[in-house]
Amino acid sequence: MSIANDNPNARPVVVLGPTACGKTRLAVALARAFAGEVVSADSRQVFRGMDIGTGKDLQDYGDTPYHLIDIVDPGAPFSLFDYLGAMQRTLDDLDAREKRPIIAGGSGLYLDAILRGYRLVEAPVDPLLRERLKHHDQERLNALLASLRPLHNTTDTQDRERTLRAIEIAYAELNEDSPSVQISIDPVVIGLHCDNDRLRARIRERLETRLDEGLIEEVESLRAEGLSWRQLDELGLEYRYVALYLQEQLNRNDMMQKLASAIYLFARQQVKWFRRMERQGVAIHWLEADDAPLDNALALLRR
């Protein structure tokens, strides 16, 4: 993006942090301050009809434009490759209109792919390849994967379907004609920090608010639109536990307690991912979520 290189004072901004720490509110305020637009880096906010459970907080945007929210129907396939392609198109559009991107989210994989420039290739399922490999046992599949991609993930060798998928991707990477995508930006990265006790309280408060706003009704609506219990479970967190409640496998109090605990554990995993990104070279400027984050972010960006 030219704005990342030609004008250092207009570098893209990334706002990251664990769930419930105020990322959306800060991103919107920064977009208003710097004639920018917000771009979501949340793996669930891409889905339509999942507003409350994913914390889209659309009321916080007002007239501030936002992107990569409500772009896919629930249950439709949407890969990291698809997301990065949509991100690149959005960044190109903002660059053409001289709008500053304010990327905000908590999905570690999406953020890592953006900030560390993952190069991904399009790798559709290959029926012919799978037909050739259908009689290979796991050991033989593992050997083939190792020959194609010596640095593969160990989890790719523990399940036949994962191994086949990894082999398909490896062959696609070797094909120079395979469509590829790689984000290349030089952003200022702001992280919102919240101590554990305060984070627990924020999560609990937000969960109670979401239930009051109609979280259970939202899950009922998704179910009525055709999503299976399995699909709701795969959406995780709010959708998983509310689905269990609707199936009478949990009472309301147990659902609340288990869901709050699950969200907190998820938030801790997010923090671990961000710290690992730092160890791998991503510079994150951490601000306290409860200590005037907007003022401190503005001071940082106006240096």
Curated annotation (Swiss-Prot):
The gene is miaA1. Substrate binds at T19, A20, C21, G22, K23, T24. This is tRNA dimethylallyltransferase 1. Monomer. Belongs to the IPP transferase family. Its EC number is 2.5.1.75. Its cofactor is Mg(2+). GO terms for biological process: tRNA modification. ATP binds at G17, P18, T19, A20, C21, G22, K23, T24.
